[in-house]
């Protein structure tokens, strides 16, 4: 890899490592606000710290030139910065109690974070990778998918446990739907 490509790739990997640590810190903050789900948030936070360590290992591998890879210029590095800003902003707001700290709200934030991570798809960092580097990228990507699935499952359980009204009328415009009479409307006379 040429030195310019190496420098840019190292900068991106450093930003990804910082992002993973910021997400770990956000989940740790969630665990402090939500004692009933402390284990859930703590486990996610520990995984994010692990991801940061894996990215740091990739940085060291690049510096040691232990493998062949070719950077992919299509990776959107600004997405990393935007997501990190999103994570840090929500953590600040939560600490200042400016946003709700109920489980549903925190799950929603976490879902957005994990969805954004999966959309970034770290495997797009390189057009060609080999060996351990590829394995590390796939580990992070697959564990992110697992996080998204766990969070999605919790959201589904919450949605399905909400009480639902049994007295719903038929939707507007549907046959059999009774319509309210508008007392202000002029009545039509049939003769």
Kindly label every feature range from the protein language model.
Residues 1-191:
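Non-heme di-metal
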């Amino acid at each position: 890899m040429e030195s310019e490509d190496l420098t840019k790739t190292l900068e991106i990997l450093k930003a990804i490592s910082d992002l993973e640590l910021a997400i770990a810190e956000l989940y740790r903050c969630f665990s402090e606000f939500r004692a009933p789900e402390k284990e859930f948030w703590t486990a996610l936070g520990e995984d994010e710290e692990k991801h940061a360590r894996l990215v740091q290992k990739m940085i060291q591998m690049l510096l040691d030139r232990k493998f062949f890879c070719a950077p992919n210029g299509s990776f959107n590095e600004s997405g990393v910065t935007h997501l990190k800003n999103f994570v840090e902003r929500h953590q600040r707001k939560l600490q200042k109690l400016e946003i709700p700290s109920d489980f549903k709200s925190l799950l929603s934030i976490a879902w957005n974070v994990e969805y954004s991570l999966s959309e970034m798809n770290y495997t797009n960092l390189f057009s060609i990778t080999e060996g351990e580097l590829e394995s590390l990228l796939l580990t992070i990507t697959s564990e992110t998918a697992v996080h998204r699935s766990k969070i999605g499952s919790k959201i589904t359980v919450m949605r399905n446990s909400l009480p639902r009204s049994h007295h719903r009328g038929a939707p507007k415009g549907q046959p059999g739907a009774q319509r309210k009479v508008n007392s202000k409307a002029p009545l039509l006379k049939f003769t």
